[in-house]
A protein has these predicted regions:
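Mature extracytoplasmic domains of secretory-pathway proteins
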Residues: 50-97
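A short, polar/proline- and glycine-enriched secondary-structure boundary/capping micro-motif
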Residues: 68-71, 95-104, 130-136
Length: 140
């Protein structure tokens, strides 16, 4: 009986957790990479569109027209609340990193909103140069 109560309690918690996943707001959101936004807040824009149950498409960029530095994103994601399971392509180009060459990330990636943050941060933070950390954020 004790184990039945524990199992029932866990199942109830799991169901409640799944029900509390809020839909992602569709439309325009801000995107940043810290190298372009450092000392100024000039976010880029992404457009998010619902394509199915908890499924969305995303496309957009942040670009500095003076330096031609940028981050672009195009793909789809599954909404898991504070975690987005992204599948697609992210390209960043910062003149002082990776020899000024674009860094391309393809396939499955995770964005996560930790604590009270109001944005999802890309969890695969290592740039193609193998030593630089990029913070790519998509704001709620």
């Amino acid at each position: 009986m004790k184990y039945l109560l524990i199992a029932t309690s866990l199942l109830y918690t799991l169901i409640q957790t799944q029900e509390t996943v809020k839909p992602v707001r569709t439309g325009t959101h801000s995107i940043t990479i810290q190298w372009i936004s450092f000392n100024k807040f000039t976010p880029g824009k992404v457009f998010i569109k619902k394509t199915g149950d908890d499924e969305y498409s995303i496309q957009g960029e942040q670009r500095d027209r003076k330096s031609n530095e940028y981050v672009t994103i195009k793909g789809t994601f599954l909404n898991r609340g504070r975690i987005l399971k992204f599948n697609g392509k992210i390209v960043s180009k910062i003149n002082t990193i990776n020899g000024g060459q674009p860094c391309e990330l393809n396939g499955l990636s995770i964005f996560k909103a930790s604590g009270k943050r109001q944005y999802w941060r890309l969890q695969q933070m290592l740039n193609c140069d193998g030593q630089t950390t990029d913070y790519i954020d998509i704001y709620f």
